[in-house]
Amino acid sequence: MNQGNPPPYPGPGPTAPYPPYPSQPMGPGFYPPGPPGGPYPPPQGGYPYQGYPQYGWQGGPQEPPKTTVYVVEDQRRDDLGTSTCLTACWTALCCCCLWDMLT
């Protein structure tokens, strides 16, 4: 058997043309209509006015003013000189070790 030339199919061919498809509207965005009124009933109080957020917009209740909070350090560090010196020493030691490893 040759792949470019397979043997003919032994079964019977189609006896009649396919039935015509029913005509359907074509185009993007076509969907069948849903149930009237939508799938859920409207809320008992009705819908709020459309197109705007409910709060803080055109007559809605305003947000309360923000409270400013100041954070104050409750303990003053008097050993600033020692801490600065220790930080500088650690930085120098780290740089020296790093320089030694790279060279």
Swiss-Prot record:
Xref: InterPro entries: CYSTM1-like (IPR043240)
Key words, A-Z: Membrane, Transmembrane, Transmembrane helix
UniProt subcellular location: Membrane
Residue ranges, compositional bias (Low complexity): 46-56
Keyword Transmembrane helix attributed: yes
Secretion signal, residue range per the UniProt entry: none
Membrane topology note: Single-pass membrane protein
Stretches with biased composition (Pro residues): 1-45
Origin superkingdom: Eukaryota
A Gene Ontology cellular-component term: membrane
Disordered, as annotated region: 1-66
Residues annotated as transmembrane: 80-97
Record flagged with keyword Kinase: no
Principal location listed in the UniProt entry: membrane
Protein family (similarity comment): Belongs to the CYSTM1 family.
Protein name: Cysteine-rich and transmembrane domain-containing protein 1
Organism encoding this protein: Bos taurus
